[in-house]
């Protein structure tokens, strides 16, 4: 049955307009994005299939074009639309960080990092460069690694910090395993970066580890 044949109160778009987006399930929100289903499946049915295949929204957002387009009814145009929505959300969060003290805004920082890193299949190391008032100057993905590790070079991090004339930096990387727990190597790397940047008067404010559904702060754990 097509969604247009459903009772008006049960249609995702009408429910959102009446009650707000928080009232809808993940499948209903995704169905509004999809707009239409395929033969024999409503947009909600198709949304549920996508969420099941990719193990939720996080997996769906991290899916590459090849995997996404293997789902019947999904093609390059829909993939591009999804990526555009994600990028707009990421940029909106980055705008918020640029206009406020990042250390006074832990919520937006975490949200930005989760949107940028959670669900990625390989480790990615990100640096957020800040000015003297802890406002974001730039965010850069500096290194990419394998499923279990990333090679990070302090010299390159220092060069990028000097390029941006940064006064401070926040680091982040993801754990594809899903566990937001620091390894011994993570702790050693953080201290190495801190010492290297200290030589050029750049402060390391925090290092976040992004796992599945969780983000750990080195500063909050007393590890910086």
UniProtKB/Swiss-Prot annotation:
Q: Where is this motif: JAMM motif?
A: 173-186
Q: Which InterPro entries does the annotation name?
A: MPN, RadC_JAB, RuvA_2-like, UPF0758, UPF0758_CS, UPF0758_N
* Residue sites binding Zn(2+) per the record: 173, 175, 186
User: Per its UniProt entry, which superkingdom is the organism in?
Assistant: Bacteria
> Which Gene Ontology MF annotations are present?
metal ion binding; metallopeptidase activity
- Cystine pairings recorded for this chain: none
Residues folding into a coiled coil are: none
List residues of the MPN domain. 102-224
Q: Name one GO biological process term.
A: proteolysis
* Keywords from the UniProt entry: Hydrolase, Metal-binding, Metalloprotease, Protease, Zinc
Similarity section: Belongs to the UPF0758 family.
Question: What protein name is recorded for this chain?
Answer: UPF0758 protein Nmul_A2138
